[in-house]
Design a protein with these regions (language model features):
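Active-site-adjacent core segments of small-molecule enzymes
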Residues: 21-198
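Gram-negative bacterial Sec-dependent N-terminal signal peptides
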Residues: 1-20
Length: 198
């Protein structure tokens, strides 16, 4: 009787353990800023006072002078006159000590200081696509990567996730055939926003 009870208890524990370690191949239903902060901390550790995403970066100051063509075509303060700008070039991920030789996306953010205390901000990546069609897919990919780092998932789990969420695979596929630029200033940056003109 004792052997049977122990055997049933052991099977129950194994069944519970397998269920607890099962990795979802579906993107989460929602993604909040706090979700990303948490997963970046899990993946890269605690770095007080440092941004959680694109943690390693360098800033620069400059000025933006719109072309005569832009001034003639667009009726917007951004193209009306010269403006001081602040730029930040960065490495993707949450590690402030990231290896700049890594084949990873780089970012560029630009803040335009316009008249009347107005600002305009744009951002770009060195990849023509993002790691997911929406925040949920990207968050799911980061969570799979963390589970793999913890030994709770495998490369097969990531492959299944990417098959279920093919948009999350495209950036990694693109990076495999494109080496990073030697310098931030010699890279091509792709806008992460779409602008329509009339």
């Amino acid at each position: 009787m004792q052997t049977t009870t122990t055997y049933i208890a052991l099977l129950s524990a194994l069944s519970f353990s397998a269920a607890a370690q099962q990795v979802s191949i579906q993107a989460p239903q929602s993604a909040t800023a706090n979700d990303f902060i948490e997963v970046f901390k899990q993946l890269s550790g605690e770095h007080p006072g440092v941004r959680k995403g694109h943690a390693k970066g360098v800033c620069a100051l400059g000025s933006f002078e719109p072309s005569a063509t832009a001034q003639a075509r667009f009726d917007t303060p951004l193209f009306s006159e010269q403006a001081p700008i602040t730029l930040r070039f960065s490495m993707g991920g949450g590690n402030p000590n990231a290896d700049e030789a890594a084949n990873a996306p780089r970012g560029m953010a630009v803040m335009f200081d316009l008249d009347n205390n107005r600002q305009h901000k744009i951002a770009g990546l060195t990849t023509p696509m993002f790691a997911g069609k929406n925040p949920e897919q990207f968050l799911g990919l980061l969570r799979i990567n963390y589970a793999i780092a913890q030994g709770e998932a495998t490369g097969a789990d990531r492959k299944a996730y990417l098959e279920a969420n093919p948009e999350a695979a495209r950036q990694g596929e693109w990076l495999q055939s494109h080496q990073p630029a030697a310098e931030y200033t010699s890279a091509n940056y792709f806008g992460i926003h779409t602008f329509y003109t009339t």
